[in-house]
Amino acid sequence: MVSVSEIRKAQRAEGPATILAIGTANPANCVEQSTYPDFYFRITNSEHKIELKQKFQRMCDKSMINRRYMYLTEEILKENPSVCEYMAPSLDARQDMVVVEVPRLGKEAAVKAIKEWGQPKSKITHLIFCTTSGVDMPGADYQLTKLLGLRPYVKRYMMYQQGCFAGGTVLRLAKDLAENNKGARVLVVCSEVTAVTFRGPSDTHLDSLVGQALFGDGAAALIVGSDPLPEIEKPIFEMVWTAQTIAPDSEGAIDGHLREAGLTFHLLKDVPAIVSKNIDKALVEAFQPLGISDYNSIFWIAHPGGPAILDQVEQKLALKPEKMKATREVLSEYGNMSSACVLFILDEMRRKSIQNGLKTTGEGLEWGVLFGFGPGLTIETVVLHSVVI
């Protein structure tokens, strides 16, 4: 008779979870940050709020964002005036948009990832879907399974309302699934659409205005599995270690509430300080076992919640400016796409590493870190090992 320990041993993969493919997608509607204040105040019938518009213009100018992509076009917003008001009951209109668009955009990214992976979609064993944009039953995971034509017995995991740290969360979960289920191939999808958070400006709630200056739409998809098939699957990054922690004394620093007016976010001004204060401890826990204490010797992927967070982390750790190059590039070209951001940065980094003729997918370096920051204040940490190009 076979023992439980023998069964468990046979169920486990031998090697670490590995990212085998990455795909990304954005809505067709591209919004230039330089002209966005004019559009935003016009479409929300707020052009009379001259001082507030000037404040918003300064926010956009300081955001380090050049452009964003948004599902919400002028035509859609004109058809849904309640979405343009500040805190007007509008949840039905928002939900009707995102329950369709979130899985659709996710499919676009997933198709690209599956194509790069090069294996038939019938080999996908697990699906992790993550979004902070809208809620429905059956969920976006079910809708994506139908859209892609995946097998009905794919094991699905649906993560709603996690926020900006969740790009790290999906990697942590995918790692555990791949390493504990021999032969598993996990499709990971993060899809975010700002139709749930868009609203007009308010003189009394400037933190809402910050979100209007930063958030953009995007979806990213990965294929994750252990023990890649030689000559068939091409590893991009290995995931070696993960952690999640709640920063001390950070309650209320970032929170979101889904109500009749849609999803509202509240940010305290000291969010960058809280992140930078706690990042050193997270790094020590992650890299001390590897004998690494020079954080300029590793590659960096950090959720770009905004330029102030990146600036303070750089300052706290005395990081060289080039360490955050891939992160800042994604912020500049796409804005803050919540959970999808860090996956876009993974893609950006491996592409630039190949283009620049570097030795590894991690900017020529062996080890790296991926950080997610979000409501809680929650910090996700993933230790990555690059792959020789």
Curated annotation (Swiss-Prot):
Swiss-Prot/TrEMBL catalytic activity: (E)-4-coumaroyl-CoA + 3 malonyl-CoA + 3 H(+) = 2',4,4',6'-tetrahydroxychalcone + 3 CO2 + 4 CoA
A single BP term in Gene Ontology: flavonoid biosynthetic process
Stored Pfam families: Chal_sti_synt_C (PF02797), Chal_sti_synt_N (PF00195)
Single Gene Ontology MF annotation: naringenin-chalcone synthase activity
Biological or metabolic pathway of the protein: Secondary metabolite biosynthesis; flavonoid biosynthesis
Keywords: Acyltransferase, Flavonoid biosynthesis, Transferase
Catalytic residues (positions): 164
EC number(s) given by UniProt: 2.3.1.74
Domain of life: Eukaryota
Broad EC category: transferase
Database matches in PANTHER family: CHALCONE SYNTHASE 7, HYDROXYMETHYLGLUTARYL-COA SYNTHASE
Job of this protein: The primary product of this enzyme is 4,2',4',6'-tetrahydroxychalcone (also termed naringenin-chalcone or chalcone) which can under specific conditions spontaneously isomerize into naringenin.
Family: Belongs to the thiolase-like superfamily. Chalcone/stilbene synthases family.
Protein name stated in the entry: Chalcone synthase 4
Organism: Pisum sativum
UniProt lineage: Eukaryota, Viridiplantae, Streptophyta, Embryophyta, Tracheophyta
Gene: CHS4
